[in-house]
Amino acid sequence: AHLSSLIGEGILKTLKEENLWDIYENLEIPLSRVLAYMERNGVLISRERLEELGRELDENLRGIEREIYNLAGMVFNLNSPKQLATVLFERLKLPPIKKTKTGYSTDVEVLTELSKLHPLPAKILEYRELFKIKSTYVEGLKKYIQSDGRIRPTFSQTTTATGRLSCLNPNLQNIPARGTWGKKVRECFIAPEGYKIVSFDYSQIELRILAHLSGDENLREVFYRNGDVHMETAKTLFGKDEISDDERRVAKTVNFGIIYGISPYGLSRSIGVDQDTAREMIKRYYERYPKVKNGRRR
């Protein structure tokens, strides 16, 4: 206790010297109390739903396994990159795309590209997705369920440099949200009797701040009329008024990527296009919102 008090005196002095005392006293300390409350309460989860989901995943995994073995013409260890490489590049004669120190790569990028040539790589990707959900979320979450049916993770407000919260044991901030199986995992989290689970989120808060700080009239105008900024950006990127859900998702990636300085290469990887197309998208974005570009330079 004595040593802690000595360390504390030095830290408090530094906080004041760095003009951080106000943030510490009025933001970090109140937040720590909220997080302590969250950790103490935890979240209720249905073990029965998890186990039912596990059985459903097992059945689907077995079906995918059979399809893979039929396509490959042989049985092999699906979790062995070396055996998979042998099947893809020697047995099926598919072209190797990337080489590592241990041999030809069978990572997501390679399998996605090879899926254009043969149905087997797509099935491997599907198998991996379901296997991860089963092992990481279904089996992983069960280990943390306490006697009262709740999971109590640990939240940290000082781990990330950006100020975002981190969560571990388990990481409940990383529960999948998209796709049929991701939604089924989320459905395992339940409310106590007499309560409901509700979700609140700031509406495009980062882009609103960008509109305010950059002063870009076009971006501000979208928010002034309560428009859908991702839809408006998509119209600019694709040069048309009728926008699909997939095109809106691309625009969303561009909108948030621009804030953090995404490169043509980074954007091309994120949305699955070539670098020239990504570069043209960034160019069109800045033509629509010119003050965003000027603001980023400042």
List each model region and its residues.
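Substrate-binding beta-hairpin/strand module that engages nucleic acids
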Residues: 25, 230, 245
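Conserved "right-hand" nucleotidyltransferase catalytic core of DNA-directed polymerases
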Residues: 1-180, 196, 203-206, 264, ...
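Positions in alpha-helical segments
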Residues: 109, 232, 252-253, 265
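Short, amphipathic alpha-helical "recognition" segments used to contact nucleic acids or chromatin
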Residues: 250-260
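Short, leucine-enriched amphipathic alpha-helices that occur as contiguous helical runs
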Residues: 28-31, 247-252
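Function-dense linear segments that define catalytic or interfacial modules
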Residues: 1, 157-242
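A short, structure-level motif marking secondary-structure boundaries and short turns
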Residues: 19-20, 50, 215-217, 248-250
